[in-house]
């Protein structure tokens, strides 16, 4: 058996994926590992690049964009490692991070109590950034969706708003969940950018989520099983946050699926009445600026997805 299976989801992030793969192969030593890339129907030359420059990579060519969790699961289906390391395509390893995770778990005196490991992530300037947070409560989720509605309402006359500014503006609403002063130790959830787990059913994502909340949902299950989610010092990993979202409008595909996923998470894990949350999201979608974009995506389909999400449990 191999020690670790590294699973990377790629969707039209050719340059980022190249740099990520390059760092994995250059930095990973003294461990038996494989790299699996699950591609979600990329059209930017990613597949050709991987075949040419990284022939040892196990490449899964999905016919369409399956979403983050489903694509990772396709990698999990063929993984042969004792451990799984989910790694975002917009990350770069600066040291032998995979071996550090492996050694930490293997040498732990209470390894049977560990559910997942993650590192303290760095930005491109070497500063620590969001690496995890508290498992969100219903109030946290509702607060965040109200923040989105507030921004959209204020933005209806501006026509354009980009991801970076949105995240800055909403940071106060997320403060209860995002942990700024990241330290080694137990945490509610580890970001899905670098998630190290045993290769078993605990590593499988719920495919009801297309985008966002997948890792939070997975780690909520670990929480229910009294398995620890730990951030550890040692691994040095750069996360180029939102580099692959450059220029996205916040009412685009990703934000809408974040809203839908918030309903799934609330209904499934928190067992809460989602009526108020549904109303906030639907009110957001009725704003002229938002509605204009949603109509282009397929409003009827999105409303249907939202209603189905409310029934997931």
Label the model's feature ranges.
Residues 84:
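Short aromatic/hydrophobic "clamp" motif used to bind/position activated sugar donors
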Residues 152-168, 172-197, 246:
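A recurrent flexible, glycine/aromatic-enriched loop bordering the glycosyltransferase active site
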Residues 23, 39-48, 64, 94:
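A conserved acidic beta->alpha catalytic loop
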Residues 7, 122, 216-307:
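Active-site-adjacent helix/loop segment of glycosyltransferases
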Residues 179-236:
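A short, conserved alpha-helix in the catalytic core of glycosyltransferases
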Residues 61-79:
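Glycine-rich, basic loop-to-helix element that forms the pyrophosphate-binding segment
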Residues 22-32:
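Short, acidic, metal-binding catalytic loop of nucleotide-sugar glycosyltransferases
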Residues 96-134:
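Conserved donor NDP-sugar-binding/catalytic core segment of glycosyltransferases
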């Amino acid at each position: 058996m191999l020690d670790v299976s590294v699973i990377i989801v790629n969707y039209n992030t050719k340059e980022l994926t190249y740099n990520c793969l390059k760092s994995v192969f250059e930095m990973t030593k003294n461990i038996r590992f494989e790299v699996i890339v699950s591609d979600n129907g990329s059209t930017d030359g990613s597949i050709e690049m991987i075949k040419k420059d990284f022939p040892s990579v196990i490449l899964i060519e999905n016919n369409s964009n399956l979403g983050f969790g489903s694509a990772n699961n396709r990698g999990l289906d063929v993984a042969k490692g004792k451990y799984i390391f989910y790694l975002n395509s917009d990350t770069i390893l600066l040291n032998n991070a995979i071996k550090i995770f492996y050694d930490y778990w293997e040498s732990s005196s209470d390894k049977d109590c560990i559910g997942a490991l993650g590192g303290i992530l760095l930005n491109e300037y070497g500063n620590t950034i969001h690496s995890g947070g508290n498992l969100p409560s219903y109030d946290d989720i509702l607060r965040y969706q109200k923040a989105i509605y507030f921004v959209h309402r204020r933005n209806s006359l501006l026509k354009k708003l980009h991801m970076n500014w949105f995240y800055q503006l909403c940071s106060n609403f997320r403060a209860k969940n995002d942990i700024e002063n990241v330290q080694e130790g137990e945490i509610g959830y580890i970001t899905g950018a670098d998630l190290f787990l045993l290769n078993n059913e605990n590593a499988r994502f719920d495919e009801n989520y297309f985008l966002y909340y997948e890792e939070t949902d997975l780690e909520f299950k670990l929480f229910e099983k009294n398995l620890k989610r730990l951030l550890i010092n040692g691994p040095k990993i750069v996360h180029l946050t939102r580099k692959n979202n450059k220029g996205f409008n916040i009412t685009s595909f990703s934000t809408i699926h974040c809203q839908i996923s918030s309903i799934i998470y609330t209904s499934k894990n928190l067992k809460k009445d989602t009526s108020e949350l549904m109303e906030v999201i639907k009110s957001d979608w009725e704003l002229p600026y938002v509605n204009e974009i949603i109509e282009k995506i397929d409003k009827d389909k999105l409303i249907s997805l939202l209603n189905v999400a409310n029934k997931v449990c």
